[in-house]
A protein has these predicted regions:
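Long, C-terminal-biased catalytic regions of enzyme "large/alpha" subunits
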Residues: 1-189
Length: 189
């Protein structure tokens, strides 16, 4: 829970790891780099909001805590692509492993940032740069923009459905499901 009061308005700069690409993410510096990137966005906001009327409370909050929220999307897409049932023990163990990886790597990055650039006021004595590092937010729009992967850690609500958009009705077929159906020769327009 982010702090908010008469004195401060909270901010949290968000991004999500696309878990449809977990096999590439797990052995890379992606989470570390994403955490550094989000902290850089905090600094960019701090720099650009200086003297802007109406942003004083949120700017002060960002200066003192540098809250970021690195989350995830595409978990169900990864499971589908790899033939792992969503409600299986294997999926549960994998989700725990992924969440731990994101938590550990974002903490490692926050500690590195604190050593390199210092701890903000609300983190003094803790050896970290960010009061918050992870946030598993809904990612409906982002997931759609990333090729129609599943939202956050959630399963797709349906496998084939029509969706209203600014350009009209769109037929939505999750990419991993679409590939599996083509593979099995059971998909048709």
């Amino acid at each position: 829970m982010l702090h908010s009061s008469e004195e401060y308005t909270y901010s949290c700069i968000l991004a999500s790891m696309n878990l449809a690409n977990w096999d590439k993410i797990k052995d890379s510096e992606s989470v570390f780099i994403a955490t550094v990137f989000l902290d850089c966005l905090c600094q960019d906001f701090i720099n650009k909001s200086e003297g802007v009327i109406g942003l004083e409370k949120v700017r002060d909050f960002t200066i003192k805590g540098r809250a970021i929220g690195l989350g995830a999307m595409g978990f169900h897409t990864y499971l589908q692509a790899n033939g792992i049932p969503y409600d299986s023990i294997q999926a549960t163990l994998l989700s725990n492993k992924i969440a731990k990886h994101i938590q550990d790597e974002s903490l490692r990055a926050s500690k590195w940032l604190a050593k390199k650039f210092g701890e903000p006021e609300w983190c003094k004595g803790y050896g970290v740069r960010n009061t918050h590092r992870t946030a598993y937010a809904p990612t409906k729009s982002t997931a759609l923009l990333m090729g129609g992967v599943s939202e956050s850690w959630s399963p797709d609500a349906g496998m084939v459905f029509d969706m209203a958009s600014a350009v009209g009705e769109l037929r939505r077929i999750p990419p991993a499901f679409y590939e599996k159906m083509k593979e099995k020769g059971v998909y048709s327009e």
